[in-house]
Amino acid sequence: MNSLVATPPVPPHIYEYSRLSPSRPMSTPSHTPTTNRKRKAEDEHNDFDSRMSASPTNSPAFTPRTLPSSSRQIKRARPNMGGRPLSLPRLLETLDTDALRGVLRSICDRHPNLADEVVQTAPRPSVASALQVLRNYQSALQSSFPLGGNPESDYAYNRVRQPLGNLLEALSDFTPHFLPPNETQPSISLSYLDDVTEIIHQLPRWSSPQNNIERDSAYDEICKAWILVIREAAKRGGGIQLQYGGWDQKLAKHNQNSGGRLQAAVNDLASSLGWMHGPESQGFGSPGGNDLGSIREQLLSGTYGLGTPVKVGPW
């Protein structure tokens, strides 16, 4: 009978409470909250590390790049290997002075219209460069002499005839270049003539007079060059450059070494500087001539009257 007794209905709010608030055990371990907080801190730290290590996908500075594949060539591709001639700049680098000179001479011979352009483009030869070329010819002449025997004999002359002709030809070609009106500076012309005359002094002397004709002709040509330059230099400042350059003494020494072959140039120099040397030469040994020469030297040097006392008071 008791089993048939109906149980009283449970109020609805009991079901609602049981759904919203599930039952929990009454007794929980004391260490559970601490463990949960520790795990939560570790999870937050790991989450922060993962966010910092990850690259932002929306960053404007990030540009995705693809790594080069193994088939892509990193270095510049070279053309197909094969024989080919050198370019003009590389070819010119391999040529020495003699070879380059020969190439230019050959081109100018085949194309005469290029000769003037080469002359205008090339730098003007200096006295030093011209003398270096002449000394090279002189060295070739000296090395052509036979060993032993008489260096003034006809045999020696025949052995050195070709290099001797090359030197004399170079002298006749270079000298007009340093003469007026092509050379406008008398100092450059005089400097060239001074060195070239010394080279002529060193030309070999031969026992046969006919072999010395070329040497005598060289003296005649250089004497004419001296006269031309002296007259041109005398027009510049009354010839003061000739006086203070000591060219009268240098030319007199050259004339002595040549055996008087330059006497005409010495006379022309004395005539050009006659207003300086005339009274001294005419009154040589007389007190008057020496006094006039001394006064002229003081005037030219700017020392005239420095030792004279200045008069003070009424004249």
Swiss-Prot record:
Role according to the record: Involved in ubiquitin-mediated protein degradation. Regulatory factor in the ubiquitin/proteasome pathway that controls the turnover of proteasome substrates. Targets proteasomes to the nucleus and facilitates the degradation of nuclear proteins.
Ranges annotated as spanning the membrane: none
Primary localisation category: cytoplasm
Assigned protein family: Belongs to the cut8/STS1 family.
Keyword Cytoplasm listed: yes
Cellular component annotations (GO), alphabetically ordered: cytoplasm; nucleus
Lineage summary: Eukaryota, Fungi, Dikarya, Ascomycota, Pezizomycotina
Keyword vocabulary terms for this entry: Cytoplasm, Nucleus, Protein transport, Transport
Region called Disordered, residue ranges: 1-88
Gene it is expressed from: sts1
Compositional bias segments (type: Polar residues): 20-35, 52-72
Single Gene Ontology MF annotation: proteasome binding
UniProt cross-references to Gene3D superfamilies, sorted A to Z: Tethering factor for nuclear proteasome Cut8/Sts1
Subcellular location: Cytoplasm; Nucleus
The species this protein was found in: Emericella nidulans (strain FGSC A4 / ATCC 38163 / CBS 112.46 / NRRL 194 / M139) (Aspergillus nidulans)
Biased composition (Basic and acidic residues): 40-50
The protein's name in its UniProt record: Tethering factor for nuclear proteasome sts1
Protein origin, superkingdom: Eukaryota
